[in-house]
From Swiss-Prot:
Listed Gene3D superfamilies: 3.30.160.20, 3.30.230.10
Ribonucleoprotein found in the keyword field: yes
Protein name: Small ribosomal subunit protein uS5
Molecular function GO terms recorded: small ribosomal subunit rRNA binding; structural constituent of ribosome
Function according to Swiss-Prot or TrEMBL: Component of the ribosome, a large ribonucleoprotein complex responsible for the synthesis of proteins in the cell. The small ribosomal subunit (SSU) binds messenger RNAs (mRNAs) and translates the encoded message by selecting cognate aminoacyl-transfer RNA (tRNA) molecules. The large subunit (LSU) contains the ribosomal catalytic site termed the peptidyl transferase center (PTC), which catalyzes the formation of peptide bonds, thereby polymerizing the amino acids delivered by tRNAs into a polypeptide chain.
Domain of life: Eukaryota
Pfam families: Ribosomal_S5 (PF00333), Ribosomal_S5_C (PF03719)
Keywords of this entry: Cytoplasm, Ribonucleoprotein, Ribosomal protein
InterPro entries, sorted: Ribosomal_Su5_D2-typ_SF (IPR020568), Ribosomal_uS5 (IPR000851), Ribosomal_uS5_C (IPR005324), Ribosomal_uS5_euk/arc (IPR005711), Ribosomal_uS5_N (IPR013810), Ribosomal_uS5_N_CS (IPR018192), Ribsml_uS5_D2-typ_fold_subgr (IPR014721)
Coiled coil segments of this chain: none
Length: 249
């Protein structure tokens, strides 16, 4: 008798995991093509805060994989979009992905492709490249770790406006499911939200909430008014190391 065919095994299909994470050995085979990528791989830059401090553009998602290894992603919405052509309607799939480490970093990616898997994979890459820092704060006394936002912030996209309001410790995230997931991946534990407009449009609602939470770094609170010396940019400090790995033809 012939042996039975092995059963097909499926991977972990739970949401919120590392769906677009790097494979084993992919990081080792990464060859940086930018100065920032070469400095990160060489260990000269060890945190994303150094990148944010000098507003350095991130062009390679592997940089984020190295500096933020605990990222989690979640697919918020998948829908079909159509375009009218001479041959008829062309249908493609659009994916909206949120990514974050629940520790002050969050990103949003939107991508359209012919297949769902391709759209999700590309949206995860876009979300990694768009990761921004979040400034967290307190509702009342400055006891323990920051749990909320430092002040009220507002974001707008299309007709949707989302306002985030600090909440007392233990209140939780009072928001719609999509905005709540964005706050969780950003690391905000307690916050009130208020939204207006066509909030049924998930994409615009997420964009408005993402713009609002990103505004926490658009100003300085009084406790940050003290002058601090600005360090030199890593691209200037390690200029020779950054140029050494560049291929010359």
């Amino acid at each position: 008798m012939s042996a039975e065919a092995p059963k097909r095994q499926f991977g972990d299909r739970r949401r919120g995991g590392r769906r677009g994470g790097r494979r084993d050995g992919e990081e080792k085979g990464w060859t940086p093509v930018t100065k920032l990528g070469r400095l990160v791989k060489a260990g000269k830059i060890t945190s994303v805060e150094q990148i944010y401090l000098h507003s350095l553009p991130v062009k390679e998602y592997q940089i984020i994989d190295l500096l933020l290894p605990d990222l989690k992603d979640d697919v918020m919405k998948i829908r079909s979009v159509q375009k009218q052509t001479r041959a008829g309607q062309r249908t493609r799939m659009k994916a909206v992905v949120v990514i974050g480490d629940s520790n002050g970093h969050v990103g949003l990616g939107i991508k359209t492709a012919k297949e769902v898997a391709s759209a999700i994979k590309a949206a995860i890459v876009i979300a990694k490249l768009s990761i921004i820092p979040i400034r967290r704060g307190y509702w009342g006394s400055n006891l323990g770790q920051p749990h909320s936002l430092p002040c009220k912030v507002t974001g707008k996209c299309g007709s949707v406006a989302v306002r985030l309001i600090p909440a007392p410790r233990g209140k939780g995230i009072v928001a719609s499911p999509v905005v709540k997931r964005l706050m969780q991946l950003a690391g905000v534990e307690d916050v009130y939200t208020s939204s207006s407009g066509s909030t049924r449009t998930t994409e615009n609602t997420l964009k408005a909430a993402f713009a609002a939470i990103g505004n926490t770094y658009s100003f300085l609170t009084p406790n940050l008014w003290a002058e601090t010396p600005l360090a030199a940019s890593p691209l200037e400090v390690y200029a020779e190391e950054a140029a050494a790995g560049k291929k010359r033809y």
